[in-house]
């Protein structure tokens, strides 16, 4: 992933409001929490939809993303209270994912829009010394930055 910018660090938490209060003690300011509908999450051969409640730090990049645990998969409470992912911006995450799979990395989950376009893909943390990497596409990052700035954007 040479040259790929790290744009945010995601932390999965049990209680988003409590986590915001705690991280604020570090001098971070967070946007108001929002609920984001994930229309299509593909994980372990199954597809589901879910609502993610998240908040990003105003400070950054890299920003802090706090996500409230939900469901029984990659965002489930069994994965909470620890680093969830490091987001890496890539101009073509679909091609990059294919390259990394050829190199032996495994994808554990991916989010898609209704039209089938990729939002983010997650690499197996077992392939990176316990760190999950989220590959994120530039238009998604642009929407996140607009959202942090208070604009009404859809990531």
Walk through the language-model features, giving the residues of each.
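Short linear motifs in intrinsically disordered
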Residues: 44-48, 88-89, 110-113
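Conserved short beta-strand elements that form part of the metal-binding/catalytic scaffold
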Residues: 30-76, 117-140
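Short acidic, gly/pro-rich beta-turn/loop elements at beta-sheet edges
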Residues: 20-21, 67, 76, 96-98, ...
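Extended intrinsically disordered, low-complexity coil regions enriched in Ser, Thr, Gly, Ala
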Residues: 17-36, 78-83, 93-113
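Long, hydrophobic N-terminal alpha-helical segment
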Residues: 1-45
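Vicinal oxygen chelate
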Residues: 6-14, 55-62, 65, 71, 76-94, 101-155
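A structure-centric signal for secondary-structure junctions around beta-strands
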Residues: 3-6, 51, 83, 117
């Amino acid at each position: 992933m040479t040259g790929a910018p790290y744009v945010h660090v995601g932390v999965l938490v049990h209680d988003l409001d409590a986590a915001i209060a705690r991280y604020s003690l570090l001098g971070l300011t967070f946007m108001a929490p929002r609920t984001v509908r994930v229309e299509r999450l593909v994980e372990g051969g199954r597809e589901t939809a879910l609502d993610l409640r998240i908040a990003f730090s105003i400070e950054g990049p890299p920003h802090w993303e706090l996500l409230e645990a939900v469901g029984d998969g990659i965002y489930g409470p069994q994965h909470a209270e620890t680093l969830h992912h490091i987001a890496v911006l890539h101009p073509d995450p679909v091609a990059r994912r294919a390259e990394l799979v050829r190199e032996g990395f495994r994808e554990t989950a991916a989010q898609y829009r209704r039209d089938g376009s990729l939002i983010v893909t997650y690499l197996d943390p077992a392939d990176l010394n316990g760190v999950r990497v989220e590959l994120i596409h530039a238009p998604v990052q642009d929407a996140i930055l607009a959202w942090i700035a208070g604009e009404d954007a859809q990531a």
